[in-house]
Amino acid sequence: MVCEGKRSTSCPCFFLLTAKFYWILTMMQRTHSQEYAHSIRLDGDIILGGLFPVHAKGERGVPCGDLKKEKGIHRLEAMLYAIDQINKDPDLLSNITLGVRILDTCSRDTYALEQSLTFVQALIEKDASDVKCANGDPPIFTKPDKISGVIGAAASSVSIMVANILRLFKIPQISYASTAPELSDNTRYDFFSRVVPPDSYQAQAMVDIVTALGWNYVSTLASEGNYGESGVEAFTQISREIGGVCIAQSQKIPREPRPGEFEKIIKRLLETPNARAVIMFANEDDIRRILEAAKKLNQSGHFLWIGSDSWGSKIAPVYQQEEIAEGAVTILPKRASIDGFDRYFRSRTLANNRRNVWFAEFWEENFGCKLGSHGKRNSHIKKCTGLERIARDSSYEQEGKVQFVIDAVYSMAYALHNMHKELCPGYIGLCPRMVTIDGKELLGYIRAVNFNGSAGTPVTFNENGDAPGRYDIFQYQINNKSTEYKIIGHWTNQLHLKVEDMQWANREHTHPASVCSLPCKPGERKKTVKGVPCCWHCERCEGYNYQVDELSCELCPLDQRPNINRTGCQRIPIIKLEWHSPWAVVPVFIAILGIIATTFVIVTFVRYNDTPIVRASGRELSYVLLTGIFLCYSITFLMIAAPDTIICSFRRIFLGLGMCFSYAALLTKTNRIHRIFEQGKKSVTAPKFISPASQLVITFSLISVQLLGVFVWFVVDPPHTIIDYGEQRTLDPENARGVLKCDISDLSLICSLGYSILLMVTCTVYAIKTRGVPETFNEAKPIGFTMYTTCIIWLAFIPIFFGTAQSAEKMYIQTTTLTVSMSLSASVSLGMLYMPKVYIIIFHPEQNVQKRKRSFKAVVTAATMQSKLIQKGNDRPNGEVKSELCESLETNTSSTKTTYISYSNHSI
């Protein structure tokens, strides 16, 4: 304000502020006005505010520090460049000039808040009724600029602080660099928009990168503040939602770290050595100091850095720390270098850029010189000539956010342009409706803009004021002592990554691992650690289980076993008893010998059918018995043959039939002998049914019971084959086999043989009863010896057969035991009953002659005398009894000796 009267620059004005807020504002404007230039001010019809980090943070007690050439001056000049371009464009805001009021935030949120109060001065009503000049005249106030919109700020923490003030006064704000997800909250920051995507998109891209590289165990590192903490929070939330990525630990870098703080952070990160990947949402200075600490602790090649856009493709954080940073994957919003700005900025000089109040300071910093006696550089520095040129006498590279600053300014300009078209149709310049711009109405136009930005990409906003996510993905690589940030992919709602272009420490192209637990081998399932789904122990799927998925094993079906990797099931091999097996060779050999011997006996008996020995043996029952013996040998071949329906049918029929033939014939013989001698003790009348025809009827009646039982078995359970997978289901699935066999259970087998065993036992009983019959009269004793031996064989068979029920060799042992037992039984019968007769027929034909027949009366006499002498047997030796019986018989019959008894005509 100025006072009328004396027009001197030192006109004293005394006034009393009626608003404390305004007093604070005024004092703030004067603070450090001598040390730092306050702002850039360009007049125009519509004034836009600008917030840029021209200076870094100052030390304690000092708000501002060193000049930031790129982030400060480059971005600031980008806004001025955009304003110039818009004001020169006849098609954009024609006849309307944009002005600016640009302030320095000094990279500090609290200082930026103080500065931003400048933007709301015009909206604060002031009561100056009590303010008087020294001469009593009322003061004249300089009218503050009415700010229609604000471009900025850069840091998310600064934008959040400023947005809280601007929303109260309904001033739209467009940021060119703030990416904190918190700013997407349209209920709290409803007047905030941005031309850069929020960190939620960036976090999604980083999660996709981590997932694509197969990393599931990572640590996070954030600078304290909205940018770092919100970015890490977004990454954590997204990784939790999609699953598959676990956070080993989260570290935070304090705003004002103590000495040694960064070394402590690195050591804490090393406590989880498997979490090599580190997700970084940190500012540039913190990134540099973290890399320094890692280098100091000699951790080159250990950490796999994933940096946010604050790292991007900057050289400063990795300068002199290239080996530590090698392989770092960084992300940056897709951008392009603006050629027009390069030409503009290179042409800036001290003479043509006086509107930038910080440009002189930039000039000194950029060229390393001093401007006159008022320069801020030390006195021993060379003086600036003013003839220096940017990019000729100094290095120059366009700062990465220049494109977004220009797009932010153009977004505001297009919104104003569209607003003017609707509110002031056909009006040249500002119409009355736009003299005072309604911020809420302008916000609607901002959110509706859609144009191609300075890089040719569309500029749009969603309902929360966020720009779409478009990122370039870089990797810091070292090749032949040269370094570069190489583009390895991009992200636009989904990841496109060229893994083959990636290079890691020591020039390795195979990407390293960052996992809590190594992948389980095939056939192993994961047993996760409680609360840490990315960490697990591997458990092998044991027995007949196979790996269904990563977390579970399941049992294979009964007819299958796990494959070699236990990742699936395969059919269990089917086996049967093969002819070449040792278990089959021995029974077959015995059976063949037995069949040959039996055939030889039958042929011999047929050849000498009418000789006394054959006739005395009872030809009819002998042939029945020999048939049974033959069948007992033959069953071996049926038991070893490959099972099918026909073979199974024959097995059922002949399994017990051979024994039934044999023991039915023997039982009939022993029963006949027993009845004859028992009848002889009582009377001289011959017992009934002792003729050959009667004997055959009895024998076949006994055999018919077996056949009837087999017939019932056929009806109840038709024969068929099965594959028994339980018989050889060993503990080791590799040895498991399915056994192809007939569906004959052990119980069915016992039932089939049970009747024959019953005949055998009965026959044995009769053999015992007739053991005292004189051997010159009958075959009782050979039959008895046969039955005793047979019983011993079958008593040995039972424990062997049933004792191997759980053995893996069950099929072989049981089949061999059964066939050998039947062959041995047949061999005993053949050897004891017929081989002596064949021997006499072949080698002693002189004994095969007709002897005097014994009448039934002689048998009765022998039986009676035997009965009497048995009573004396208790007092005499066995030999004496036998001798006396023989002598008595010889005297009674007037014969010297009779060896065989004739059964013809009821004689013995």
Curated annotation (Swiss-Prot):
Membrane topology: Multi-pass membrane protein
Binding positions for L-glutamate per the UniProt entry: S156, A177, S178, T179, Y227, D309, K401
Any GO MF annotation of the entry: group III metabotropic glutamate receptor activity
Effect of K872R: No change in sumoylation. Abolishes sumoylation
Effect of K868R: No change in sumoylation. Abolishes sumoylation
Transmembrane segments: 584-608, 621-641, 648-668, 696-716, 747-768, 782-803, 819-843
Keywords: Cell membrane, Disulfide bond, G-protein coupled receptor, Glycoprotein, Isopeptide bond, Membrane, Receptor, Sensory transduction, Signal, Transducer, Transmembrane, Transmembrane helix, Ubl conjugation
Cystine pairs: C64-C106, C246-C534, C369-C384, C424-C431, C516-C535, C520-C538, C541-C553, C556-C569
Gene3D superfamilies: 3.40.50.2300, GPCR, family 3, nine cysteines domain (2.10.50.30)
Primary location class: membrane
Tissue: Strongly expressed in olfactory bulb, accessory olfactory bulb, and mammillary body. Weaker expression in the retina, and in scattered cells in the cortex and hindbrain.
GO biological process: adenylate cyclase-inhibiting G protein-coupled glutamate receptor signaling pathway; chemical synaptic transmission; synaptic transmission, glutamatergic
Extracellular side: 34-583, 642-647, 717-746, 804-818
Cytoplasmic side: 609-620, 669-695, 769-781, 844-908
One Pfam family in the UniProt entry: NCD3G
Top-level taxon in the UniProt lineage: Eukaryota
Any one annotated GO CC term: plasma membrane
Signal peptide residue numbers: 1-33
Assembly and binders: Interacts with PICK1.
Similarity comment: Belongs to the G-protein coupled receptor 3 family.
PANTHER family recorded: METABOTROPIC GLUTAMATE RECEPTOR (PTHR24060)
The protein, known as: Metabotropic glutamate receptor 8
Source organism of this protein record: Mus musculus (Mouse)
Gene: Grm8
